[in-house]
């Protein structure tokens, strides 16, 4: 969408406010609203100054001025606001140079795509993520010096089979790990997901399907692939819609990977492929219908997977999902169709749809950083011809201990992932896509999460140790 079309859109829809949005390092959208009468063509050249020191992991107070530069092509009407509002996504620029800030996730994603094109390997990367999420009726949590707790409740939860409800307990709910694909009334979220899909399409996403997932309250909405930065933008819209539609239905939504103990967590599988001049570069005559380039791309992902974990699985909670027994792919292997492998080659109707699916990521990830790090790892694999070895077509969840010990795994904790990122960063800094400054600041920021969790007394510790 051009600047002229944006200005026309404002007039035609009697827009009252323009909401400028950007994504911080942790992956959370931030925003500032401006009266629409302040917006003209010059605004898209000059941007909006703001205080970058207020964003975690960004500027110090002594050099805090930054520029939000609106991207006219991202403009979309907000369906949730009472007054007509136009949302526009922004890049964050350094005011001295008017270049992308090296800690701005969206600028990093754009640099990754630019770097890919500069190598001559491909001109397009297509990304198709599958974020899962939970819908609950009630969530309470607190942490202070006197204690800590969390308490989740939902009508679908197995623990409510004996609960009393004012309107009566209807009894239809999924069992533990038993929620995949049942129709209503076991699936109680059909209408909510349908409403989410309609709003997503209103905001420009192309919805392909929606369904209940394996766990009580767990859902998935599948949307069509897109180019890397645009798809990351769409994931932010996806999350915004899920949160706000859930709220309107009296529910609460979360993209936290593992809120429930003893049941499956939420993943974000990321389908991806490279193309050049409209030709899918991943289609070929090698294993699974892949090209040699695609195999090298897989090799790069596997080699750098534990560093990628720092972006694809960026929470301490992520690693409560990445454990055996809950359908989470922890082994760094690839296979056609085999969902126990961390990289799968899906069955496709034609070679032009050939792609790989990286399965270890989760929806807590900042999409810009997650997708960019995977692309950079894949490009490194292509550059250095890193072959992934033999495919693993057997059930990796059921291997003998001695055999599984020979297969590399994802990182076991956020602390481990950050250490791997620190040691294995050259593939990210190629072409100046990720800077050492950003990686250092990211490690420092996420290490604060690790330290806080490690320093907080846990209720299970009372269970284990109070009577020693």
UniProtKB/Swiss-Prot annotation:
Q: Which family does it belong to?
A: Belongs to the glutamine synthetase family.
Which parts of the sequence bind Mg(2+) 2?
Answer: 132, 213, 220
What is the name of this protein?
Answer: Glutamine synthetase
Q: What does this protein do?
A: Catalyzes the ATP-dependent biosynthesis of glutamine from glutamate and ammonia.
> Which sites bind Mg(2+) 1?
130, 269, 357
- Every copy of the GS catalytic domain together lies at 105-468
Activity control, as annotated, is: The activity of this enzyme could be controlled by adenylation under conditions of abundant glutamine.
Could you state one GO biological process linked to this protein? nitrogen utilization
Cellular localization per UniProt: Cytoplasm
**Stored SUPFAM superfamilies:** Glutamine synthetase, N-terminal domain (SSF54368), Glutamine synthetase/guanido kinase (SSF55931)
SMART domains xref list:
Gln-synt_C
Task: Describe the location of the GS beta-grasp domain by residue ranges.
Answer: 13-97
Origin: domain of life = Bacteria
One of the entry's Gene Ontology molecular-function terms is: metal ion binding
For the ligand (ATP), the binding residues are 208, 271-273, 339, 344, 352
Cofactors, names only: Mg(2+)
The record ties this protein, via Pfam families, to: Gln-synt_C, Gln-synt_N
Give the cofactor note.
Binds 2 Mg(2+) ions per subunit.
Tell me if Phosphoprotein is a UniProt keyword of this record. yes
- Which reactions does this protein catalyse? L-glutamate + NH4(+) + ATP = L-glutamine + ADP + phosphate + H(+)
> Which keywords describe this protein according to UniProt?
ATP-binding, Cytoplasm, Ligase, Magnesium, Metal-binding, Nucleotide-binding, Phosphoprotein
């Amino acid at each position: 969408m051009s600047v002229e079309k944006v200005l026309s859109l404002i007039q035609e829809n009697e827009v009252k406010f323009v909401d400028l949005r950007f994504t911080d390092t942790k992956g959370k959208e931030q925003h500032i609203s401006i009266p629409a009468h302040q917006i003209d063509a010059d605004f898209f050249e000059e941007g909006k100054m703001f205080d970058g020191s207020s964003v975690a992991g960004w500027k110090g107070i002594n050099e805090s001025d930054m520029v939000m530069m609106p991207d006219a092509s991202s403009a979309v009407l907000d369906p949730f606001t009472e007054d007509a509002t136009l949302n526009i996504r922004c890049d964050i620029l350094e005011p001295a140079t008017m270049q992308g800030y090296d800690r701005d996730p969206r600028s990093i994603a754009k640099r990754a795509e630019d770097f890919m094109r500069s190598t001559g390997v491909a001109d397009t990367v297509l990304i198709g993520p599958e974020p899962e999420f939970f819908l609950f009726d009630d969530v309470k949590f607190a942490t202070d010096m006197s204690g800590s707790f969390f308490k989740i409740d939902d009508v679908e939860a197995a623990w409510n089979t004996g609960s009393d409800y004012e309107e009566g307990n209807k009894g239809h709910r999924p069992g533990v790990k038993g929620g995949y694909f049942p129709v209503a009334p076991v699936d109680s979220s059909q209408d909510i997901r349908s409403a989410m899909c309609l709003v997503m399409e209103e905001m420009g996403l192309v919805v392909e399907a929606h369904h209940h997932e394996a766990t009580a309250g767990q859902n998935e909405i599948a949307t069509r692939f897109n180019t890397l930065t645009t798809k990351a933008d769409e994931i932010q819209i996806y999350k915004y819609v899920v949160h706000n539609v859930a709220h309107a239905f009296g529910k609460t939504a979360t993209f936290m990977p593992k809120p429930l103990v003893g049941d499956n967590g939420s993943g974000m599988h990321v389908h991806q492929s490279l193309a050049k001049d409209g030709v899918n570069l991943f289609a070929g005559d090698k294993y699974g219908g892949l090209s040699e380039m695609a195999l090298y791309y897989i090799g790069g992902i596997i080699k750098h997977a534990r560093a990628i974990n720092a972006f694809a699985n960026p929470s301490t909670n992520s690693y409560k999902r990445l454990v055996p027994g809950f359908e989470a792919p922890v082994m760094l292997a690839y296979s056609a169709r085999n969902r126990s492998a961390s990289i799968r080659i899906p069955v496709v109707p034609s070679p032009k749809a050939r792609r790989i699916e990286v399965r270890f990521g989760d929806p807590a990830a900042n999409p810009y950083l997650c997708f960019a790090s995977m692309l950079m790892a894949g490009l490194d694999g292509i550059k250095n011809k890193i072959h992934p070895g033999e495919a693993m077509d057997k059930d990796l969840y059921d291997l003998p201990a001695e055999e599984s010990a020979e297969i590399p795994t994802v990182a076991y904790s956020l602390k481990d992932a950050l250490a791997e990122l620190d040691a294995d960063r050259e593939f990210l800094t190629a072409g100046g896509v990720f800077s050492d400054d950003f990686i250092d600041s990211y490690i420092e920021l996420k290490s604060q999460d690790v330290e806080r969790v490690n320093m907080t007394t846990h209720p299970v510790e009372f269970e284990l140790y109070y009577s020693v």
